[in-house]
Design a protein with these regions (language model features):
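Non-catalytic interfacial helical region
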Residues: 2-145
Length: 145
């Protein structure tokens, strides 16, 4: 139950993380949302975040800036990914990575452990932006002229 939102436009990357968080909240309405910044979080903070608390059996853990994570945090997330794939009571984890080469080893390690990757489109050209907007309208069964 680990997802990595990878690369692309920063606004769309944030939007996808918000969408996944809302989907997880709809599936587990009693869950807490715990946000960690991988820049200063360590493996102990991650272990505490995914563990049950007095108020909720599970938490929805959002790990921002995965590209800044240290090796130990990456190893713990990968190990959790391997364990949580068969656990119905596992806490969903949503990792946000800006893309690029920084933190690529940790990204690859977590993907290899079984995480689901969601690549965000990079909208640098005007045609790509227009096509993306049109797809968003179509997805919501709306029309724009």
């Amino acid at each position: 139950m680990v997802s990595i939102v990878y690369g692309g436009d920063s606004y769309l990357n944030d939007q996808r993380v918000r969408d996944l968080t809302h989907q997880a909240l709809n599936a587990y309405p009693d869950a807490d949302v715990v946000e960690l910044d991988a820049t200063d979080a360590d493996r102990y903070a991650f272990d505490e975040a995914v563990s049950p608390s007095l108020l909720a059996d599970r938490a929805i853990v959002v790990v921002r800036n995965l590209q800044n994570a240290d090796e130990k945090l990456g190893d713990v997330i990968a190990a959790y990914c391997g364990q949580s794939n068969n656990d119905a009571n596992a806490s969903p984890v949503i990792c946000q990575h800006e893309g690029g080469t920084k933190g690529k080893r940790i990204h690859d390690l977590i993907i290899k452990a079984g995480a689901r990757e969601e690549k965000v489109p990079d909208l640098k050209k005007a045609d790509a932006k227009i096509n993306f907007v049109m797809q968003q309208f179509e997805r919501r069964h709306r029309r724009v002229n």
